[in-house]
Amino acid sequence: MTLHTSPILHSLLDTDAYKLHMQQAVYHHYYDVDVAAEFRCRGDELLGVYADEIAHQVDLMRFLSLNDDEFTYLSSLPFFKPDYLHWLRGFRFNPQQVSIKNNAGKLDIRITGPWREVILWEVPLLAVISEVVHRHRSPNVTAEQALVQLSASLESFRQHSADVDLSQFKLMDFGTRRRFSRDVQQTIVTALQADFPYLIGTSNYDLARRLDITPVGTQAHEWFQAHQQISPTLANSQRAALQMWLREYPSHLGIALTDCITMDAFLRDFDLPFAEAYQGLRHDSGDPVDWGEKAIAHYQRLNIDPMSKTLVFSDNLNLDKALALYRHFGQRVNLVFGIGTRLTCDIPGVKPLNIVIKLVECNGKPVAKLSDSPGKTICQDQNFVCELRKAFDLPRVKKAS
């Protein structure tokens, strides 16, 4: 197997925006917290054969740093503080935090260290894994082929939406982590910027800066997971996470992720003060229509006009699914659609990887993501899952994977 030695990543900002948003909050409030995260391939693919090449790319990541233009760009945004940005300027990836093994054909990756540092590994490392695998599996695929497929998808969208008022349709690129390649993502986002007036942003800070697009993203599951061990009381951990986020970002980045414990448990914690303070909610697992109906009903019970709030859908979307949700909810609540893999790895003959890196420990103790989709549940410690379900008064479900 040919080893590609040139670096895949060229910028520290080639990551999802919410990683920097969370990192700043961790830097300010949880500087000494340690965590562990692990790689999961949700399919049955054996990716261990690529371990050496992935490890080489991880080693090259130690040379990435914030340059002057990037520092100036981040400084222009209203929610970053000078102390964090000066610290970030000195940040370097430490490859010794990452263990990569070919375990009988299975790819094993474990990342350990201070949360403020470990937090930045997930997205660029997933992008590296995806690009390494696709380089070998589809060596002749070009960005032009991705562009042809995008053109067909946009034409289909235009035909299917001809009878719909799209003035409030909003699309965000969420495609960094499982992209076919860095080049393909840039090609796709550039094309959308030129040809699709409903694109409002990208989660990728590097592309946002270079293409002058709005960067988008708030927090991920790990923010809520870590609080399961940071909070003195497990049953209060989700509220603690929501409250600390508001402490760091009282007037920005106000979309809350709902499915770390399940939507029902989230809504029990999401009382009137939180519902008023947060701009809206993000869906990432479970039936999107059921979820949206629950969200709207919750706002109505609290006497909050749903049209004053925003629902962000980001779970395995494509343009057709987004359009169906827009038809269903568009007159009742503000909507934004985050599409990832179906934009940046939507190429005929190419099978996208279903890969994640998730937090598994905080301060040496287990954390869990239960989700609204059993297949997305992550925890190694079944006793802790039982504790979590009891603390949040959840019914028994399928065994965690």
UniProtKB/Swiss-Prot annotation:
Organism (species): Pectobacterium carotovorum subsp. carotovorum (strain PC1)
UniProt keyword annotations, A-Z: Ligase, Phosphoprotein, Pyridine nucleotide biosynthesis
Record-listed Phosphohistidine modification sites: 221
Protein name, entry field: Nicotinate phosphoribosyltransferase
GO biological process: NAD biosynthetic process via the salvage pathway
Pathway connected to this protein: Cofactor biosynthesis; NAD(+) biosynthesis; nicotinate D-ribonucleotide from nicotinate: step 1/1
GO cellular component entries: cytosol
PANTHER family according to UniProt: NICOTINATE PHOSPHORIBOSYLTRANSFERASE
Molecular functions (GO terms): nicotinate phosphoribosyltransferase activity
